[in-house]
Each structure stands twice: as C-alpha cells, then as structure tokens.
Amino acid sequence: MKSKFLRLLALFLTIGVVAASCGSDSDDAAPATTAAPATTAAPATTAAMATTTAQVEVVADGSLLDTVQARGTLNCGVSGSAVAFSETQADGSVTGIDADFCRAVAAAVLGDAGAVNFVALTASERFTAVQTGDVDVLMRNTTWTQSRDSSVGMDFGPTTYFDGQQLMARVSDGFSASSQVSDVDGAVVCTNVGTTTEKNIAEAALLAGAEITLLGFETSDEVYETFIAGGCDITTTDGSALVGRKVKQQPADQEWVIFPATPISKEPLGPTYGQNDSAWADAVNWTVYAMIIMDEYGITSADVDAACASAEAEVGRLCGGEGELQTGMGLPADAFHQVIKQVGNYSEVYNRNLNPVGLYREGSANAGWLDGGLIYAPPAR
C-alpha cells in the first residue's frame, strides 16, 4: 500500500505539472505548442482573433456587458473541431451545441442571434483569450475545476453538459461495454499529451492495478489516426468526444466500444468568462437558465410568441411582461423571449446537435431535474 501511494504521489507531481502548465482539458483540441488544425480556424466571414488588448474596445469602469453592447458583436471562443459541440463547416459556419449557446447569449444581449464572431481556440489559448479580452465568453467544452475557478482568473456559468472521461477500444481486441479500467492491463493507450485526460487515465490505471503504456500526441487527429492504424489499443477522452469520433470515424471493418459505463472523471462543461464581473455573468448565466426554464414549461421556438402573448407569473416575467427583471440586468425586457424565438429552449438546442451522434438526454445526467437528471435552473422571480 505504501509503495502504491508513493507511486501515485510521484505520478501526480510529474503529470500534474505538465497538465497545469498546458491548461488543457480532455477536450479534443491541440495544445499551444502546435498550430491549430485547419478545421479549428475561425470562420472566413468573421474577424480573426485579436492578438493584443489594444484591438479590443473596452468601456471604462463598466461591465463587459457594456462593451459587448457598444460593439454590437459577441466574440465567442469555441473549439471549432469538437464533433456536435462546435464544428467549423466548409462554408465557414459553426455548428454544435456550444455554438448555439453563443448565439443564445448574442440574442439576449444584442437581440440578434447572428451577431456572433466565433473564435476558434486551442485548449491552451482559451484562458489567455478571455484574460486579454480577445473573447467575451468561452463556450468551448471547458471543464469547471477548483484551480481554474480560484487561480486562473476564470468564473464559470451553469453546466450545460455533464460529461466524464471514458475509454474506447476495438471489440476485436476483447473489449466490451462492460469492460473496466482493470481490463486494460498491458495496453497501449493514446491520448493528448499534457492534458488532464492523460493525468486521469494514468491515475485510474494505477489505482486499478493496471500497467499501461501512454502514447501522447499533440492533436486529437493524430490520436485517432494512430488508433485506427492499430498503433495503440485504446484511446481516451471525454465520453461525448469519443461518441462523436466513433460516429464520424469508425472504419467499416472495425467495431469500437466505449467503456466503462461509469466515467473515470467528472467533466462539467459550460460557459466560462473573466472573474468578478457580476453584470456580465448574470447576462450569460440567465440566458442559459431561461432556456432551461422555458424547456420545463414546454415552450419552444415554434410557440414562444403565442405563449408570451398571454403568459403570466414566471413565464410572463421571462417574456418581458409584468414584473420582468431583464431591464434591471441591463438587457432588453424581451431578451429571453428572443433567445427562445431565435435559438430555442435547452431541449431544442440539445436534441438538434447531440441526438444525431447518439447522445440522448433520457436517462443521463443531462436530463432535466424532473426527469432524474442534473439540469436545473433557479426560479425567475
């Protein structure tokens, strides 16, 4: 037991330093030491990410909310290569659930869901981009952790997707959906170098008594190319990313399986922004909460106009009716009406982006609280 503890301590000290210095999640993006893959480039129709704070218009002594409204555009940091979360398409458009949450914030703050400049960021670029003002908010599969909340200078909004790290292997190698980490003894595991994914799998294998060989790669594309070619037995990252890659890249002559059923880590993903700006945090957070509340009432983009025309109580307030609280937040009274009308409620955004890759709310942590899940919003009153 003492020997295992000492090995675990050494592992934390070695891998923890690398992961902290890179600031990277298990999030399907390249570390800062390499150029981002072509698919992560910002859409051609939008401006490139600013490289100096001099390029960012800032309202003196005001909230970022004032800055964004004066600018008329939301600069939203995304991955650009995360399947079903934020993918830059051939025509320059950006699709995915993260991209839709960017649009929702733009609809609330600016009245126009299309007023978004999507900025593709690598894992190591993302926090710097927020700190320098190059982006206003991250909607970029970024895990909420204690260190990021306390020492990196970030604040985190509501969790929009509850994820967890899992492993993926070939059925032909003897793995199944019921496999456990202890079953990977002797395996070669591919993952992104210098990430929390690397740290998590090394720790989990050690605790399970499994000896593994870790192969680290600078980009996720390299990870999956090596896995497909048979250069490693297993790949590991967030479960949602594995599902997306399986749908998009599994060869016809291979069958991939994801395990264990219970993830080896907790990965709460949601909006991230600079710390100590309550007005901006309120605008971002309540955009998400409004989408969740309207979902609970069954109000969708198709019927929100009719619902708001006669709504009372909580829905009426969110629609901008009597007792509304949006103007006191620095938003238009109908801010959340526009969010639902232009983008949709939480289920609409989730279903159109994640259902096609096999990620369903039912029975998952991402179900609403009334359905046994963790998606929940405080009352709008």
Feature locations, PLM:
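Short helix-initiation/N-cap motifs at beta->coil->alpha
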Residues: D61-G62, V116-T128, S176-A177, L214-A229
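Bilobed "Venus flytrap"/periplasmic-binding protein-like clamshell domains
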Residues: N75-A84, V94-V109, T143-W144, D163-E225, ...
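Extended ligand-binding regions for polar small-molecule ligands
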Residues: A50, A54-V59, D100-R103, A107-V109, ...
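Acidic, polar ligand-binding/catalytic clefts
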Residues: R103, A107, A115-D183, S240-I264, ...
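Extracellular mucin-like PTS domains
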Residues: A30-E57
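Extracytoplasmic small-molecule ligand-binding "clamshell" domains
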Residues: V56-L138, G372
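C-terminal motif of bacterial Sec signal peptides marking the signal peptidase cleavage site
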Residues: V17-S21
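Bacterial lipoprotein signal-peptidase II cleavage site
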Residues: G23-P31
